Amino acid sequence: MAKQWEVVIGLETHAQLSTQSKIFSGTATQFGAAPNTQASPVDLALPGTLPVMNRGAVERAIQFGLAIGATVAPRSIFARKNYFYPDLPKGYQISQYEIPVVQGGQVTIQVPANEKAGKEAYEKVVNLTRAHLEEDAGKSLHEDFAGMTGIDLNRAGTPLLEIVTEPEMRSAAEAVAYAKTLHTLVTWLGICDGNMQEGSFRCDANVSVRPVGQAEFGTRAEIKNLNSFRFLEEAIQYEVRRQIELIEDGGTVVQETRLYDPDKRETRSMRSKEDAHDYRYFPDPDLMPLVIDAAWIERVKAEMTELPVAIQQRFVSQYGLTPYDANVLTSSKAMAAYYEAVVSKVGPANAKVAANWLMGEVSSQLNREGLDIAENPVSSAQLALLLQRIADGTISNKIAKEIFLAIWEEKATDESAADRIIEAKGLKQISDTGALEAIIDEVLAANPKSVEEFRAGKEKAFNALIGQAMKATKGKANPAQVNELLKKKLS
């Protein structure tokens, strides 16, 4: 019998904090500036310069700690992480090691169903080890210099919050669900813009495998700088296969840092993985301990908005949504606000229908055109009226989709756009029993073979007759009434 393997994953996520200036200097942090135009003497580590802590970076770390139910350390220490790299001008990185600013905490994730693997959607709590403040390094530029490497120090000193999980995730799907939930949280709080293409939110995945039932962890490999959810999933899936095949072929997994090549969809070795002692951490003598008192924490807490998890719980309890649906609808503040605006008009009784429309037709159209919910040309009031017309029987769901696209394409600004289009195009649903009976009689007369097959026990024939009735009315017949009248006439 083949050995069964368990996957063990921990993530380290670097969230660039959305401050106007760097963590230890007053230099701007704007992305895309010309190389080395946003690098001050402090960032360049020129002699005689001293770092000064950015209060805004600390407050963003406090917000995050409060949001995940962590302990915000009353006293934390900055340390020097010593290593050589051309884009690290000081020869060390200012980080936190022994006492981080945020300790513990947890994030609840919703893992989607996987029909191919026969797995249902489920909820899981991922515990965090810590989150600490540190400065980013510069950037090495290889493309524009033949045989040479250019150094851009604009990014050096940009504030980061490194968020570290316990090694508790057991699949690539769980890791992606966690990363997406974390991304939603930091953007919701406004502490990070979450732009993965610009490197504002990037993940390192620590991956190992072990035989099922074994308590001891296997040797891990760290995959660096994964800046998309797809790359994160593909990199973990490849690395798991690589390690299992290596072990089963008699080899040994080496502790190392690896990079993911998205073109080849594989990881490759970058360097041997360092341990903490290799960095020779010691307290930074230029920075006093960071002291955060209870009053400061309370001030930050008072300014925070309702968190996604609280809104999710409210959506489940008030509107009867599933935890997964509630999670999708709180993927951004704009999405949650749009949904609540629709529900406020259609009422809690139609909250599930509103959720289905937002996650289905609306999201599909947004994805097709590469738009965010905030750029949706169909307002919440317009969608609400459309859903009300489905609820009161004026139109069918199928016709509603046509009207939605019409509102979208004409970029209508009037709240009553749905009613206007229904009237102009004559799209009102046919609910008159007499009219429907006449149409159904014609359909039955024109399709004797389907009638015979249905009476012989073939259910598909009944669906075919419904389809013919809907076709005869150009989709305007009330489907429920058609179903009922057909059954009555065929009984």
UniProtKB/Swiss-Prot annotation:
Q: What is its EC number?
A: 6.3.5.-
Q: Does the keyword NAD apply?
A: no
Mind listing the UniProt keywords for this protein, alphabetically? ATP-binding, Ligase, Nucleotide-binding, Protein biosynthesis
One Pfam match: GatB_N
Q: Which reaction does it catalyse?
A: L-glutamyl-tRNA(Gln) + L-glutamine + ATP + H2O = L-glutaminyl-tRNA(Gln) + L-glutamate + ADP + phosphate + H(+); L-aspartyl-tRNA(Asn) + L-glutamine + ATP + H2O = L-asparaginyl-tRNA(Asn) + L-glutamate + ADP + phosphate + 2 H(+)
- List the Gene Ontology MF annotations in alphabetical order: asparaginyl-tRNA synthase (glutamine-hydrolyzing) activity; ATP binding; glutaminyl-tRNA synthase (glutamine-hydrolyzing) activity
PROSITE patterns from the UniProt entry: GATB
> Please, one GO biological process term?
glutaminyl-tRNAGln biosynthesis via transamidation
Q: What class of enzyme is it?
A: ligase
Q: Which InterPro entries match?
A: Asn/Gln-tRNA_amidoTrfase_suB/E (IPR017959), Asn/Gln-tRNA_Trfase_suB/E_cat (IPR006075), Asn/Gln_amidotransferase (IPR018027), Asn/Gln_tRNA_amidoTrase-B-like (IPR003789), GatB (IPR004413), GatB_C_1 (IPR042114), GatB_Yqey_C_2 (IPR023168), Gln-tRNA_amidoTrfase_suB_CS (IPR017958)
Q: Which NCBIfam families match?
A: gatB, PRK05477.1-2, PRK05477.1-4, PRK05477.1-5
Family membership noted in the UniProt record: Belongs to the GatB/GatE family. GatB subfamily.
Protein role: Allows the formation of correctly charged Asn-tRNA(Asn) or Gln-tRNA(Gln) through the transamidation of misacylated Asp-tRNA(Asn) or Glu-tRNA(Gln) in organisms which lack either or both of asparaginyl-tRNA or glutaminyl-tRNA synthetases. The reaction takes place in the presence of glutamine and ATP through an activated phospho-Asp-tRNA(Asn) or phospho-Glu-tRNA(Gln).
Subunit-structure text: Heterotrimer of A, B and C subunits.
Its name, as the record gives it, is Aspartyl/glutamyl-tRNA(Asn/Gln) amidotransferase subunit B
- Species of provenance: Paraburkholderia phytofirmans (strain DSM 17436 / LMG 22146 / PsJN) (Burkholderia phytofirmans)
- Gene responsible for this protein: gatB
